[in-house]
Amino acid sequence: MAAAANSYADAEAAIASTRQNQLAVPAAAPTPAAAAMIPPFPANLTTLFFGPTGIPLPPPSMLTPPIRCRSVRRALQAVFTPEELYPLTGVRSLVLNTSVEEGLTILHDAIMVELATTGNAVTVFGWSQSAIIASLEMQRFTAMGGAAPSASDLNFVLVGNEMNPNSGMLARFPDLTLPALDLTFYGATPSDTIYPTAIYTLEYDGFADFSRYPLNFISDLNAVAGITFVHTKYLDLTPAQVEGATKLPTSPGYTGVTDYYIIRTENRPLLQPLRAVPVIGDPLADLIQPNLKVIVNLGYGDPNYGYSTSYADVRTPFGLWPNVPPQVIADALAAGTQEGILDFTADLQALSAQPLTLPQIQLPQPADLVAAVAAAPTPAEVVNTLARIISTNYAVLLPTVDIALALVTTLPLYTTQLFVRQLAAGNLINAIGYPLAATVGLGTIDSGRRGIAHPPRGGLGHRSKHRGPRHLTDSRRHRRPPTTVYRPRQ
């Protein structure tokens, strides 16, 4: 934990010189990259496609959307990796560290097998947990030195990357580890890798675009909602959305070969449940959204953008509060109020122009009542149902206990180290504020994990039309599964 606190302080010092100018006033919007430059490098002969959490083997329906199409030249292979994350993928699933460790072995073997073919070159497509695995593989290749593949033989396309240097959830809280969950905050994807890399992030994706200032509780909640409503949508993107991606700025003198892109999200994910309310849901959401946008975006440092506008290649941990002038916030809220009222009024006018239709109500017939009584459950069915409810409640309770244990045992030590480090540096405000910010941010993540602890069968990575096979295992969640040997497609 001392190392974690020291890492935090070092990272804060590294970006301190750029933070002042970028937060004092709203930053200029980065310009969209030219379509021909997305991705900024040609695909290699073979593309290895790795699925997100919950989808260990991507089905054919996942292999056609716009981002994927831009990373394929000749051969495309979906590769199996565990992609489990206790408790999000079930109470008997693998913990993150074990799943990542197994996936890293498979990814490394797959790359080396493909590159053993003379003249072959590989593009790795990673999404969510497989983006973590790809990031760790970059670190591994760096450690291999001359034995690693050459830069011309390998490149990466990553989406929904939890290790984004300046937005990923696993980089916001440096070197934090939750032993009770066997979950490591791995840090940042290497920005100095020799392998050309393109990283795409959807705005408000809570895993890949987490709030920079977690004391902003509303921004944290919006990011957590984005795990469900945004992180799952990468394969639903249209070509126009991908081509309109905004290339994020990198630090002066940056000579790396990684490009970072943000794709804007139209609606705040925190309002998606309200929009699901019939008739009045959308008008109310449109009334609230402009001002909510200002509040949420302040969690990233600028009321105009739902992502950090500072350098994308610099590992940026959480901070205390953005240095945005109060007048800028007041003006943005005033404009948001006016915009919300106009949108709400327009929605009501559109509703009033639609013909009013009332549902037809049919009273039950005597025969229907008799049939309902006959279909009533038997005592045995009632007992079995109660047993299933008890079993289900136990399954729900177990992750809650594990998460609570992780926070109770680890968070106090982490925040204490932050307090001591900042106090030793003579910064009393940060000594009090940083532990509080960490507690608010991690507590909100905890609440979100409980809410999405049992994702649909389609997987946490994607919940719409692309459904992958469910990975079944009889292994305990801390036990490493049998090693899967990668075999190239013939």
Residues of each region from the PLM?
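A glycine-centric feature that highlights glycine-enriched low-complexity/repetitive segments
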Residues: 1-490
